[in-house]
């Protein structure tokens, strides 16, 4: 079950997204604030991503409730993102880069210190149409080693091709599939 609630005024938007399993206790709550700079400008976003069950501290004490924000113990991952669509009508490629800058995204460095990992994810999207079917090709990647995404270096982690087509029943009603 994944409800979404969004609100926008001008170029500013707030979005709340959640996910829960109907058969298990897995939960996620994401809150995002975003601002688009002009009609064709980049979009800057800041988000908190919270996963239930992600913050067991070293002494075994479970402290992961939604309102617990202590560094190194919180289940929140704070992330900044920058997205941009190339202003080329025949090549509308969008590029997005997201980096976790605070919260539970941690790693032990070479000196044995618990530090912020700065895990990042990059995604390219290219929309196009073929015979009335709208398509979107996606390539997502992790640019460097990070414990958050379980990779030891550069890795392509998401390849997708999405297809949608509206089936028109009459002039006022269509069903997107």
Walk through the language-model features, giving the residues of each.
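Outer-membrane beta-barrel translocator/channel fold
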Residues: 46-81, 86, 96-108, 137-152, ...
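A contiguous pocket-lining binding segment that forms or flanks enzyme active sites
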Residues: 107-133
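Short loop/turn motifs that connect adjacent beta-strands in outer-membrane beta-barrel proteins
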Residues: 11, 38-45, 85-93, 126-136, ...
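Residues on the lipid-exposed face of transmembrane beta-strands in outer-membrane beta-barrel proteins
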Residues: 3-9, 31-35, 80-86, 95-97, ...
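Residues that define the transmembrane beta-barrel architecture of outer-membrane proteins
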Residues: 1, 25-29, 74-80, 114-122, ...
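Mid-chain, structured segments of secreted extracytoplasmic proteins
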Residues: 20-49
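Short glycine/proline- and aromatic-enriched beta-strand/turn motifs that initiate or cap beta-hairpins
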Residues: 1-22
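Predominantly the C-terminal beta-signal and adjacent terminal strand-loop region
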Residues: 141, 150-177
């Amino acid at each position: 079950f994944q409800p979404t609630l969004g609100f926008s005024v001008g170029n500013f938007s707030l979005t709340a997204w959640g996910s829960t399993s109907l058969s298990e206790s897995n939960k996620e709550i994401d809150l995002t604030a975003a601002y688009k700079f002009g009609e064709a400008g980049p979009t800057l976003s800041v988000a908190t991503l919270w996963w239930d069950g992600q913050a067991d501290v070293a002494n075994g004490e479970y402290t992961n409730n939604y309102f617990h924000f202590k560094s190194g113990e919180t289940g929140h991952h704070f992330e900044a993102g920058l997205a941009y669509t190339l202003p080329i009508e025949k090549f509308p490629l969008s590029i997005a880069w997201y980096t976790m800058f605070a919260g539970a995204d941690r790693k032990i460095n070479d000196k044995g210190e618990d530090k912020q990992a700065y895990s990042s994810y990059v995604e390219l999207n290219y929309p196009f149409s073929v015979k009335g079917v709208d398509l979107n090709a996606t390539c997502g990647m992790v640019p460097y080693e990070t414990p958050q995404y379980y990779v030891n270096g550069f890795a392509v982690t998401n390849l997708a091709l999405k297809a949608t087509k509206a089936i028109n029943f009459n002039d006022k009603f269509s069903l997107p599939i």
